[in-house]
């Protein structure tokens, strides 16, 4: 008997490419769909868009920002989600005070690079802090990441930054 469909939710500036290496294993006995957040600028909007396109019941896996979207899906429609996997994410809102301002400043600095020099230039900066140093010499991996980012625009990056900086506290979702 086939399993319920699996919806894969990519992270910040990511798309289907982040899930491609896993799809052969994940798609065994089930239909897999990778969502696109479009120009949505809130996690709740991203979650609602996912729910609007999703089947009545499904499994869910989210990576990074995508896992935060998955938490919002569970908050909005827990009865529709059979199981959920949250990968490399957090659940707390942006910190108050200096820590929160520092997070915003770092995100806006990357946005400025994307707007002034292009998304690829921003991705080249981003990859240095997000890919393990031992893998930075893997030209194929780094190029896949850069190509993935360049399929998005600075406007999409701005919308996703807004979504992350205004993220809700998901502690209650995890407790339930």
Question: Model-predicted segments: where are they?
Answer:
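Conserved HGGG/HGGXW glycine-rich cap/lid loop of the alpha/beta-hydrolase fold
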Residues: 1-47, 58-59
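Active-site acidic short loop of glycosyltransferases
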Residues: 3, 54-56, 79, 176
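Flexible "cap/lid" loop of the alpha/beta hydrolase fold
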Residues: 75-76, 80-124
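Short beta-strand immediately N-terminal to the catalytic nucleophile in serine-hydrolase-like folds
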Residues: 60-62, 87
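Short N-terminal helix/helix-N-cap motif within the alpha/beta-hydrolase-1
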Residues: 16-18, 95, 169
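Conserved alpha/beta-hydrolase catalytic His-Asp/Glu region
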Residues: 98-102, 116-175
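Active-site signature of alpha/beta-hydrolase-fold catalytic machinery across serine-
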Residues: 21, 49, 72-76
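Gly/Ala-rich beta-loop-alpha elbow adjacent to hydrolase catalytic centers
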Residues: 62-66, 70
């Amino acid at each position: 008997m086939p399993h319920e469909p699996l919806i894969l939710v990519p992270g910040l500036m990511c798309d289907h490419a982040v899930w491609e290496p896993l799809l052969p294993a994940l798609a065994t006995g089930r239909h897999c769909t990778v969502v696109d957040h479009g120009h949505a600028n809130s996690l709740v909007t991203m979650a609602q868009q996912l729910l609007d396109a999703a089947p009545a019941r499904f499994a869910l896996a989210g990576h990074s920002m995508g896992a935060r979207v998955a938490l919002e899906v569970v908050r909005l429609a827990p009865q529709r989600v059979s199981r959920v996997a949250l990968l490399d994410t957090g659940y707390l809102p942006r910190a108050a005070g200096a820590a929160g301002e520092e997070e915003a400043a770092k995100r806006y600095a990357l946005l400025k690079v994307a707007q002034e020099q292009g998304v690829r230039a921003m991705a080249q900066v981003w990859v240095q802090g997000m890919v393990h140093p031992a893998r930075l010499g893997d030209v194929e991996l780094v190029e896949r990441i850069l190509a993935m980012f360049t399929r998005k625009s600075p406007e999409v990056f701005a919308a996703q930054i807004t979504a992350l900086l205004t993220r809700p506290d998901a502690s209650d979702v995890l407790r339930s």
